Amino acid sequence: MKKGFLAAGVFAAVAFASGAALAEGDAAAGEKVSKKCLACHTFDQGGANKVGPNLFGVFENTAAHKDDYAYSESYTEMKAKGLTWTEANLAAYVKDPKAFVLEKSGDPKAKSKMTFKLTKDDEIENVIAYLKTLK
């Protein structure tokens, strides 16, 4: 009986923590935060790639989904594994791109051109809310 309560408590704590980490963001605020990303990315439909790919339509798409962008082998490995840009994956990626790519590609030599990190949870939530509108 105690094990059942313990397991239920752990499950509830994990579910709560996951939900708290991905609270609903503000898309308008996220558009403002995305200005930090403009040196390397565009956000317009049909926009050009820069150092990084155009991010229009990235949400719920697979990793390395843009045919006109030269992704590294690490990103094509993530695509081959079926990685999709969900809220959780985007949040983990923008928080620490290098660590994310190392973990998800399975390649200990994995690299990412993206060195910029968003560290504030509210900015991450807001940028994700903005990316969700770009479809």
Curated annotation (Swiss-Prot):
It comes from the Bacteria. Keywords: Electron transport, Heme, Iron, Metal-binding, Photosynthesis, Signal, Transport. GO terms for biological process: electron transport chain; photosynthetic electron transport chain. Cytochrome c2 is found mainly in purple, non-sulfur, photosynthetic bacteria where it functions as the electron donor to the oxidized bacteriochlorophyll in the photophosphorylation pathway. However, it may also have a role in the respiratory chain and is found in some non-photosynthetic bacteria. Belongs to the cytochrome c family. Pfam families: Cytochrom_C (PF00034). Binds 1 heme c group covalently per subunit. Residues 1-23 form the signal peptide. Heme c binds at C37, C40, H41, M114. One of its GO terms (molecular function) is electron transfer activity. It comes from Rhodospirillum rubrum (strain ATCC 11170 / ATH 1.1.1 / DSM 467 / LMG 4362 / NCIMB 8255 / S1). This is Cytochrome c2. InterPro entries: Cyt_c-like_dom, Cyt_c-like_dom_sf, Cyt_c_1A/1B. The gene is cycA.
